Amino acid sequence: MPSNMKQFCKISVWLQQHDPDLLEIINNLCMLGNLSAAKYKHGVTFIYPKQAKIRDEIKKHAYSNDPSQAIKTLESLILPFYIPTPAEFTGEIGSYTGVKLEVEKTEANKVILKNGEAVLVPAADFKPFPDRRLAVWIMESGSMPLEGPPYKRKKEGGGNDPPVPKHISPYTPRTRIAIEVEKAFDDCMRQNWCSVNNPYLAKSVSLLSFLSLNHPTEFIKVLPLIDFDPLVTFYLLLEPYKTHGDDFLIPETILFGPTGWNGTDLYQSAMLEFKKFFTQITRQTFMDIADSATKEVDVPICYSDPETVHSYTNHVRTEILHHNAVNKVTTPNLVVQAYNELEQTNTIRHYGPIFPESTINALRFWKKLWQDEQRFVIHGLHRTLMDQPTYETSEFAEIVRNLRFSRPGNNYINELNITSPAMYGDKHTTGDIAPNDRFAMLVAFINSTDFLYTAIPEEKVGGNETQTSSLTDLVPTRLHSFLNHNLSKLKILNRAQQTVRNILSNDCLNQLKHYVKHTGKNEILKLLQE
């Protein structure tokens, strides 16, 4: 069996494999905690001194009558930031000593500092667990500065504090768009609660408009999955923090490249256009889309009769929550069975096909259950954020951290935290019974529109509002209550309308905007003159 780790949950584990003597010194100086990402808001980076001379000096001072010099040198090797690549070695960055690091030059795989003239390269064999913001660099020559100008560490939770660290690896076109939107959202929330423009709304509408105009089959595939909360829609469609697998809902070739979306803004009145997408659910045509097996056109019921889909979903709710044994073992298994039926047969209680073939094919292997639990969790976190009397960046940071590190979409079944039977255990084999609050969240999930989710047209929502059920209420809440709860978010977002008067249709203007973005102003002028 191999004796060395290939991925690391801690920097100390990597040190144990490479330099146990240095690890022992760090431990003896009570500095192991300084290498933990949990200690810092923005992760941690360790600079390992390759030069034996520096390590010998650390050892000599550590075991002397005054180990302060060894402590200071070790502190200079610890950066309270997650810096995985040279591209992130920018801005106000310093070591644990508080000394600012001045970068002289960055190359593809190397950073050269001015002060100390240290030459740093990323440790090729250090790969952290996906949810750990840890990095290790090798100092090949020079030294880290012990004195110099201080760097200005941003205040935790302060007004200028970014919602999440900007350093993330890998830095893909998807993550670039997400980080830009997150920064814009944090800025506008602190200014006016995004009452003028909501960045998540703008980008979600733009992406859907692009698909509708340029890739109608992709548009039909994703339309049943859009959410009344544009923040949820944005992350489910873009999947910006997924780093493993190629089962993206929307392929890379459609999103990026010479003819891709590339994050272009394509909207005139964001709120009105967003609501319009929900009215389109019952107005799609499938004359040119046939089932790959039968070659017959079979209109998915999520489009032809969404109300009946939700009626059947309510039957499933009732069966699960009125089951003879509502408990932490039986109930999650019944949830999984319902999702297995949907994934494998595209039916709910043998009624179907629920989704277009392309949609259900994209949701297999636990992805549909993962998506719906994601909706439920993010809805809850977002509601908490919006219910606060004053906006707190830290509340928004919690949402983004959850998406980045707990639910990136790398392993759907392992990222299930509420609905997976494995979280509750089997009392006959493990005796592991989950806390009551987790089970209460499962019941709330079943009692929400997020359970077996399909989008429903806004005009189909009606009825008198009733009191929302509590987390432990086993009686399914009526359908209109679920939907009115999410639709209430649209009342807030109505303030985010941006209307531009024009004599061209929205579709025409959106096509022109995308053309200008990727071909240049002169070309569009030539086109208009023809």
From Swiss-Prot:
Reported impact of residue 16 to H = In strain: Isolate Uganda
The consequence of residue 106 to K is: In strain: Isolate Uganda
UniProt keyword list = Disulfide bond, Host cytoplasm, Late protein, Ubl conjugation, Virion
Per the UniProt record, the site (DNA-binding) maps to 10, 39
What switches on its expression? Expressed in the late phase of the viral replicative cycle.
Instruction: Give me the Gene Ontology terms describing cellular component.
Output: host cell perinuclear region of cytoplasm; virion component
One Gene Ontology biological process = viral capsid assembly
Ubl conjugation as a keyword of this entry, yes or no, is yes
Q: What is the effect of changing residue 131 to N?
A: In strain: Isolate Uganda
Spell out the residues of the site Cleavage: 158-159, 463-464
Q: What's the effect of swapping residue 87 to M?
A: In strain: Isolate Uganda
Q: Which residues form a coiled coil?
A: none
Record family assignment: Belongs to the asfivirus polyprotein pp62 family.
This chain's protein is named Polyprotein pp62
The species this protein was found in: African swine fever virus (strain Badajoz 1971 Vero-adapted) (Ba71V)
Highest classification ranks of the organism: Viruses, Varidnaviria, Bamfordvirae, Nucleocytoviricota, Pokkesviricetes
